[in-house]
Amino acid sequence: MKVARVSEIKLLDREAAEKYGVKEEILMENAGASVARLAVSLIGLPMSAAVVCGPGNNGGDGLVAARHLSSMGADVKVFLVAAPDKLAGIVKENYERVVKAGIAVEVVDEERAEGLSEELSLFDVVVDALFGTGLSRPLEGVYRKVVEAINGSGSLVISVDIPSGVHGDTGQVLGVAVRADYTVTFGLPKLGNLMYPGAELGGELYVHHISYPRALLEDSRLKVETNDPVPLPPRRPDTHKGDYGKALFVAGSRRYMGAPLLCSKSFLKAGGGYSRLATIKSIVPFLGVRAPEVVYEALEETASGTVAYGNLERILELSKSSDIVAVGPGLGLEEETLRLVCDLARSVEKPLIVDGDGLTAVARCGEYISERRAPTVLTPHAGEMSRLTGKSVEEVRASRVDAALELAGKLKAYVVLKGAHTVIATPDGRAYINLSGNPGMATAGSGDVLVGAIAALYGLGLGFEEAVRMGVFVHGLAGDIAAEERGQDGLTSVTLMNYLPKALRALREDFESVLERYTIKVLP
């Protein structure tokens, strides 16, 4: 499903009216009606509803919802956080319709907002139609107090388009924000609906297309979409290990022995065929006991126990017989090892995954990545992204989609910005938001498992971009299945790795159910 920026949804609104004759009044009517239908479907009739409306179009949607709820038989009261004589256009028209319908309306000022929470608690549902995706400055004064009253009511809360106080493009909180149980967003989901903390504050998300023409909903100018899974290539009877990919992992050091084990073994757990691990010779005996199914290439090491630069030619030779190369997990930050990573990035002619400490090296030699002919994917978390971009961690987290797109364009590489709802950016300016995964996966080594999963999906026969996307999705799906069976607490990376086969099995045996699980619900 496509995902829109605030500016893009405004463009779609305009084109819906100008090209297709779907006027703003129609969109608002359909939006408000969909909120009313959801409320009734959740609670049933009879029911009572408080509809909190702001001064703009979001408030207009709420006024329409109030009228439809009343028509359905609900006991409705509108709390208008605006002066009625300041309303304009179709918002004013819908206010007048509410008044003519005999629906109770109370104007809320700052003084009235003080005790509003207690009254809101008397209603079965509170509809939050205070502010929508156009909000760009922190909520203050009466608006802040009203949001706090909604949050303190204890009633079921449905937000209109996006929780009031959440930035429509970033998901960041503008001072204070409504915490909704459900959100109905219109046309398409917005970035702010899917980026945290907005995604959490919105509760369960629904989309209503409000009669946008299909051509607009699928417009090629919309460059962001959800990371929907694709079917896996079949495993045919007449195949051997080489048919499922040969991966080379350059990983590990004396200090970090878990990372090389996790990435190289996860490749096999996710369906890959032949896993080869190039790591320092002193730890090979220990790793071999834990993962005898991996093929080891013992490398010379520095005095501090990292991969020595003198291994460059040998690693390059090994890469020639590999389908994909992954560099970085657990390599450490020894200067000559970082120099080795840079020269590998420049010289390896196969598709390349760079993760972990390898990203610290790339931060120094990004031009080597941008000059590569074979595709590359970088898999940073927010801290590593900060080093790669020069932005602060806070800046990265505040605008994750834009940060990933900017780096992908600059380095001509795929970027997987890990985190809640991981962002996958492509070199040509597209982005995908991944919806699988859970907080239990926030554990040491989880990223190493992801490296193996991406390599494996490429080995199974997907194109590079699809392999990156599906590697991220499968990684999250494995975490979700593990959390369902074992709980999120204590979910280790080894457990996550061991659930990769179950994730692949779910995709092969019941693909439609998996797809439905991670598809945003569309209201009829």
UniProtKB/Swiss-Prot annotation:
InterPro entries: CARKD (IPR000631), Nnr (IPR030677), Ribokinase-like (IPR029056), YjeF_N_dom (IPR004443), YjeF_N_dom_sf (IPR036652). Signal peptide: none annotated. It catalyses: (6S)-NADHX + ADP = AMP + phosphate + NADH + H(+); (6S)-NADPHX + ADP = AMP + phosphate + NADPH + H(+); (6R)-NADHX = (6S)-NADHX; (6R)-NADPHX = (6S)-NADPHX. Residues 57-61, 132-138 are annotated as: NADPHX 1. Keywords: ATP-binding, Isomerase, Lyase, Metal-binding, Multifunctional enzyme, NAD, NADP, Nucleotide-binding, Potassium. Residues 9-218 form the YjeF N-terminal domain. It comes from the Archaea. Residues 224-507 form the YjeF C-terminal domain. One of its GO terms (molecular function) is ADP-dependent NAD(P)H-hydrate dehydratase activity. GO terms for biological process: metabolite repair; nicotinamide nucleotide metabolic process. In the N-terminal section; belongs to the NnrE/AIBP family. The gene is nnr. This is Bifunctional NAD(P)H-hydrate repair enzyme Nnr. K(+) binds at N58, D128, S164. Residues 224-524 are annotated as: ADP-dependent (S)-NAD(P)H-hydrate dehydratase. Residues 381-387 are annotated as: NADPHX 2. Binds 1 potassium ion per subunit.
